[in-house]
Amino acid sequence: LQVTLLESPDVAPIGVGEGTWPTMRDTLRKIGVSEADFFRECDASFKQGSRFDGWVTGQHDDRYYHPFVLPHGYTETNLVAGWLARHQDREFAGVVSFQPHLCARNRAPKQASTPEYAAVANYAYHLDAGKFGLFLRAHCTGRLGVAHISDRVVSINASDDGDIASLQLKNHGVVAGDLFVDCTRMQSLLIGQ
């Protein structure tokens, strides 16, 4: 399997803060990324859930909290019925999960001595997306054998069935492939043609 990253020199990466889901931990682990390097290079921090303020009524006390730790016993009983019967004056997540309490106290999901990608509480990351893109490119080209071409797509060459057969680049000729993934955001350079 040969993977080639084709990147336009004319399009600046998005350099805003982003949040991920816990599945990102396993993805990074599987491709051999050091979690310590990832934190350092991408200005990453722990994310233990998502809180949506003003979720239903828009009032200051209206929020929905989605912790990343599954509630104990959630497969054996209807936790919502128990919450409604006994604790509906409190936030559901805080009743069924310890993770909102960790977050409220600014506690991490693991200790400094906990091995990479292991944790007491499930977590994801907040990160700088621009730095993350550069970090992944360096890791994938340096350690995973991904080829990198910085060039512009001039035209798209279709096969008889209408699928993309190859891309004509401004400076690097033709790049053929079996699968093309369009990451050109709103431009939809490949999907739109």
PLM region spans:
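Alpha-helix-centered segments that form part of catalytic cores
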Residues: 89-127
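Dinucleotide-binding Rossmann-like beta1-alpha1 core, especially the glycine-rich loop
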Residues: 12-103
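Conserved beta-strand edge residues that scaffold enzyme active sites
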Residues: 7, 42, 154-155
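Predominantly flavin-linked oxidoreductase catalytic cores and closely associated redox partners
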Residues: 114-193
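Short loop/turn segments at secondary-structure transitions that flank enzyme active sites
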Residues: 9-12, 58, 183-189
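Glycine-rich FAD pyrophosphate-binding loop
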Residues: 1-16
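Short, well-ordered amphipathic alpha-helices
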Residues: 1, 31, 191-193
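General structural concept
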Residues: 4-7, 24, 31, 38, ...
